[in-house]
A protein has these predicted regions:
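Auxiliary Fe-S-binding modules of radical SAM enzymes
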Residues: 1-82, 88-89, 272-388
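Conserved Radical SAM active-site core
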Residues: 66-105, 109-220, 224-232, 240-253
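A structural motif corresponding to the C-terminal end of an alpha-helix
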Residues: 184-190, 247-257, 326-329, 353-364
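Short hydrophobic alpha-helical runs that function as membrane-insertion/retention elements
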Residues: 193, 259, 289-291
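Active-site glycine- and acidic-residue-rich loops that bind
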Residues: 199-202, 266-275
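Glycine-enriched alpha-helix->loop->beta-strand junction motifs that scaffold or abut catalytic
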Residues: 213-216, 257, 283-287
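Conserved strand-turn element in the central/C-terminal portion of the radical SAM core barrel
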Residues: 226-228, 235-237, 250-270, 293-296, ...
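Internal, well-ordered alpha-helical scaffold/interface segments
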Residues: 242-249, 253, 263, 272-284
Length: 388
């Protein structure tokens, strides 16, 4: 290891953040050291601080022998997730599904606000740059899914895909794990709801259209901003806003129920775009819409604050003042029933604006409903063939 790339083990707390720009709150927390811009080009996070379960923090430092600028950029590596099950269960009372699939761990889209980032800490990796550059694929996901659907006693309900990490992130283009999963679900007549930020979803429009005709599929695409600069900064490797809107149009034209998700809504950053995003989505043929306020659990809070300081320092104080107004004076409140929409006058105003715009555009007049009536349990090895 070159001197410039030397690593130094530090007991927590982590290294203090770089000096704050004028006007930033004096209570800005201690954060990881920001990685040189050239090394993290095309990434969302500014740093790669250790996860919350690590006993020591490791940071690169320049000891004067070489320049940190000579260190290589963060490249994407892909490992294998050997999990023996692919369906994850949940009993959260404020979400509309009880099971989900995530074909990948980590997400190359690099959305700085992603609430799934803290899950990388379970792997001993950073929720920062590691989350978007050290990915894990579940190559056996389609086979595992078929096995779980075939299990005695399995009760079909809609499976949500993309609730944690995006199933159509860039590596899906070559891995095609998601397409394999859809093929299994189509054969079994099992309903699926997909959430993505990627226009790659239209690759599978053939399968989705056939499933939609049987009320087995619907797709939600998140559009966070129509401002290309803001979108590129917050979601560096996700599809551009125009491509997402075009994907919504293609899906809608194919008869696939579509939803636009205005998510996350960030006060003083993108909340002014709510009506314009809904207008554009309705023009693309979307019939349903939803929104979610910015969520900052665990390490996401500090990663978002770093990003905000680096990109919009003049808005930092205002953004967090409004966030706290909607979160009971805190940066985040994980209370069920409130974590998605927040509380207080600002949260109420955002909700009313969203509702008024949806009424004006005729959105959410009818909700698409998926069915389990077509479910046929996959045959397992050893199952007798039916004679009738």
């Amino acid at each position: 290891m070159s001197p410039a790339a030397s690593s130094h083990a530090l007991k927590h707390p982590p290294v203090k953040a770089p000096s704050e720009p004028a006007g930033v709150d004096s209570d800005f927390p201690e954060l990881g050291v920001a990685i040189d811009r050239a090394r993290r080009r095309g990434r969302g996070a500014q740093s790669n601080a250790s996860g919350r379960y690590e006993a020591e923090a490791r940071v690169a430092f320049d000891d004067g022998w070489q320049s940190l600028e000579e260190l290589p950029p963060f490249t994407t590596s892909v490992g294998v997730d050997t999990s023996r099950k692919v369906i994850t269960r949940n009993d959260s009372p404020d979400i509309g599904f009880d099971r989900s699939i995530n074909p990948y761990r980590g997400c190359e889209h690099g959305c700085v606000y992603c609430f799934a980032r803290p899950t990388h800490a379970y792997l001993g990796l950073s929720p920062g740059l590691d989350f978007e550059s050290k990915l894990f694929v579940k190559p056996e996901a389609p086979a595992l899914l078929e096995k779980e659907l075939a299990a005695t006693g399995y009760e079909p309900r809609m499976i949500a895909i993309g609730t944690n990490t995006d199933p159509y992130q860039p590596i899906e283009r070559e891995r095609k794990i998601m397409r394999g999963i859809l093929e299994v679900l189509e054969r079994a007549g099992h309903p699926v709801g997909i959430v993505t930020k990627s226009a790659l979803v239209v690759r599978d429009i053939d399968i989705l259209a056939r499933m939609a005709k049987r009320n087995l599929a619907k797709v939600a695409i998140s559009v966070t901003s129509l401002d290309p600069k803001l979108a590129r900064s917050m979601e560096p490797r996700a599809s551009t806003p125009p491509k997402r809107l075009e994907a919504l149009k293609q899906l809608s034209d194919a008869g696939i129920p579509t939803t636009v998700m205005v998510a996350p809504v960030i006060p003083a950053l993108n909340d002014s775009e709510i009506e314009r995003i809904l207008d554009a989505a309705a023009h693309a043929g979307v019939k349903e819409a939803s929104y979610v306020l910015l969520r900052l659990p665990l390490e996401v809070r500090d990663l978002f604050r770093e990003w905000l300081m680096a990109n919009y320092p003049d808005r930092y104080r205002h953004v967090f003042t409004l966030i706290r107004d909607m979160r009971g004076g805190r940066d985040y409140d994980a209370k069920w029933g409130e974590r998605m929409k927040g509380t207080g006058p600002m949260a109420w105003t955002i909700g009313r604006r969203f509702e008024i715009a949806c009424d004006r555009l005729g959105l959410n007049k009818r909700r698409s409903k998926l069915t389990t009536d077509h479910f046929s349990r996959p045959k397992r090895n050893g199952d007798q063939l039916s004679l009738f």
